[in-house]
């Protein structure tokens, strides 16, 4: 007697835990690059996020009457926490990452039934809730630490996150007071605010000469483009390992680049398309967030449509919206469209005629 089982009858051989660990490994170049340019805050934020995520997931699974260890061992909750920790400002107050992680795990994942059931990317749910609820804390970034006279030590980072002061009693803003033209905003924030209030091209050229953009006089938005390149390298690694598919990141980046380039021909509007690609969370979102296998499209054509849709939304938000980045909102808006995309891009079943043929 043979036991009848439903399709599919093939298996990729990749366990969920192995996939999650490969993704975490691919994020390490960007993780250490962020430490190099912005200090140890991301280490502490990651530890807080992962610890909070494990506790929240353990309790949620226990309340559902299941065995927590069977679910925690897939490392998916650790990856969600790490993504969120790397997305927020490194020196945000400790309660910000705790609230965001709880929202990501409980509202973004467990409320739908756990891994594989959630329609939205959990980390982006947590991030957007934080951005809307605590805009000041979520937009206060320290400039690259090489611009500071006294870069914060690990002890300073710990003290800043938990008390708002360094071990010497300085606030985050006081650490940057000696740098001309420095604000506690990202280059994308600064460029967008400046563009809306200044229309002269010469004025904008003066902006990008400030230290946060030029650093030692050669780097545009130093720290940010290096982190984006590190995410790009990690993303290419995942594609080569066949952990993620190329369609989503390529479609997203190409769509955004084409739209941004076309906009540039209409006159001075914003940063160049290349500058946009290596700023903010563009590469992070393209390779590590939009490619989430649970919340992204699963059909070959659907992946291209989904990626292009994310790129379109990022363009609309960055160029015409109020938020300077827009990657998180773009991914969540595209997640809404996934069921419709998959419905209309399902591959033809073998043996059935193509549409329009008998």
Curated annotation (Swiss-Prot):
Which key words tag this protein in UniProt?
Cell inner membrane, Cell membrane, Electron transport, Flavoprotein, FMN, Membrane, Phosphoprotein, Translocase, Transmembrane, Transmembrane helix, Transport
Q: What is this protein called?
A: Ion-translocating oxidoreductase complex subunit D
Predominant localisation class: membrane
Top EC class per UniProt?
translocase
Entry's transmembrane regions = 19-39, 41-61, 79-99, 125-145, 220-240, 248-268, 271-291, 297-317, 321-341
**What gene name is given for the protein in this entry?**
rnfD
Tell me which cofactor or cofactors this protein depends on.
Answer: FMN
Per the record, the domain of life is: Bacteria
Q: Which PANTHER family does the annotation name?
A: ELECTRON TRANSPORT COMPLEX PROTEIN RNFD (PTHR30578), ION-TRANSLOCATING OXIDOREDUCTASE COMPLEX SUBUNIT D (PTHR30578:SF0)
Chain positions with FMN phosphoryl threonine modification: 186
Where is the protein localized? Cell inner membrane
* Topology relative to the membrane: Multi-pass membrane protein
This entry's Enzyme Commission designation comes to: 7.-.-.-
Give the function comment from the record: Part of a membrane-bound complex that couples electron transfer with translocation of ions across the membrane.
Q: Identify the InterPro entries for this entry.
A: NqrB/RnfD (IPR004338), RnfD_bac (IPR011303)
Outline the subunit composition: The complex is composed of six subunits: RnfA, RnfB, RnfC, RnfD, RnfE and RnfG.
Any one GO CC term of this protein is:
plasma membrane
By sequence similarity, the record places it as follows:
Belongs to the NqrB/RnfD family.
């Amino acid at each position: 007697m043979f036991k009848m089982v439903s399709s599919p009858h093939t298996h990729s051989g990749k366990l969920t835990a192995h996939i999650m660990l490969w993704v975490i490994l691919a994020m390490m170049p960007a993780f250490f690059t962020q430490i190099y340019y912005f200090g140890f805050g991301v280490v502490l934020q990651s530890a807080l996020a992962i610890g909070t995520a494990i506790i929240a997931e353990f309790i949620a699974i226990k309340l559902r009457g299941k065995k927590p260890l069977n679910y925690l061992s897939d490392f998916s909750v650790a990856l969600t926490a790490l993504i969120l920790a790397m997305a927020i400002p490194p020196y945000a107050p400790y309660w910000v990452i705790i609230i965001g992680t709880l929202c990501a795990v409980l509202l973004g994942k467990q409320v739908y039934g756990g891994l594989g059931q959630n329609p939205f990317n959990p980390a982006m749910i947590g991030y957007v809730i934080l951005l809307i609820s605590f805009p000041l804390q979520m937009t206060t970034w320290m400039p690259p630490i090489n611009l500071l006279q006294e870069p914060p030590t690990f002890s300073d980072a710990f003290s800043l996150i938990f008390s708002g002061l360094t071990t010497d009693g300085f606030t985050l803003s006081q650490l940057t007071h000696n740098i001309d033209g420095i604000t506690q905003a990202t280059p994308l924030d600064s460029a967008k605010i400046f563009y809306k209030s200044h229309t002269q091209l010469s004025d904008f050229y003066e902006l990008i000469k400030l230290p946060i953009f030029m650093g030692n006089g050669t780097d545009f938005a130093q720290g940010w483009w290096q982190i984006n390149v590190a995410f790009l390298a990690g993303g290419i690694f995942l594609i080569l390992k066949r952990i993620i598919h190329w369609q989503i990141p390529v479609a997203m980046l190409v769509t955004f680049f084409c739209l941004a380039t076309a906009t540039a021909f209409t006159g001075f509007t914003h940063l160049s398309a290349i500058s946009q690609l290596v700023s903010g969370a563009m590469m992070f979102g393209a390779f590590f967030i939009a490619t989430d296998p649970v919340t992204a499209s699963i059909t070959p054509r659907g992946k291209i449509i989904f990626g292009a849709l994310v790129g379109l939304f990022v363009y609309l938000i960055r160029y015409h919206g109020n938020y300077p980045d827009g990657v998180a909102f773009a991914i969540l808006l595209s997640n809404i469209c996934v069921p419709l995309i998959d419905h209309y891009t399902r591959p033809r079943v073998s043996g059935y005629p193509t549409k329009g043929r008998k």
